[in-house]
């Protein structure tokens, strides 16, 4: 059985997709970009500012589904510029302290709305 997850505390999808889908004990979170859900605007600033907003959006979706950051098991990070990797990691480490999920980070030529970062995540909860 699958369940669509939606919360006003994260940005509305910018296309024909769900914020997240819960399937069994898994939660699949769609790629999140640094949109402030209160304003609907892209967060201005550097990679740290944008990474923080993306992770706050993911956290809000997790909480809406009854999960937490500790339940995240896999993350995919899309960066516009791999030179931002170290700065992104500084912020990322604030959110994933002891419970570090498996992760991949790749550089891409372009992201929606020309943002610097997009992150998708998979969570699992017994």
Curated annotation (Swiss-Prot):
InterPro entries documented for this protein: RidA, RidA_CS, RutC-like_sf, YjgF/YER057c/UK114
Stored PROSITE patterns: UPF0076
Family: Belongs to the RutC family.
Protein name in the entry: RutC family protein PH0854
One annotated GO molecular function: deaminase activity
Entry's Gene Ontology cellular component terms: cytosol
Entries under Pfam families matching the protein: Ribonuc_L-PSP (PF01042)
Disulfide-bond pairs as recorded: none
């Amino acid at each position: 059985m699958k369940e669509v997850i939606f919360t006003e505390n994260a940005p509305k999808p910018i296309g024909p997709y769900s914020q997240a889908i819960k399937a069994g004990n898994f939660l699949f979170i769609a790629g999140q970009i640094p949109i402030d859900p209160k304003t609907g605007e892209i967060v201005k600033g550097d990679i740290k500012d944008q990474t923080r907003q993306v992770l706050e959006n993911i956290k809000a979706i997790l909480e809406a589904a009854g999960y937490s950051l500790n339940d995240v098991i896999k993350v995919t990070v899309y960066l516009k510029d791999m030179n931002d990797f170290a700065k992104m990691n500084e912020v990322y480490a604030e959110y994933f302290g002891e419970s570090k999920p498996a992760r991949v980070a790749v550089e891409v030529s372009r992201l929606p709305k020309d943002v610097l970062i997009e992150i998708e995540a998979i969570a699992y909860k017994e």
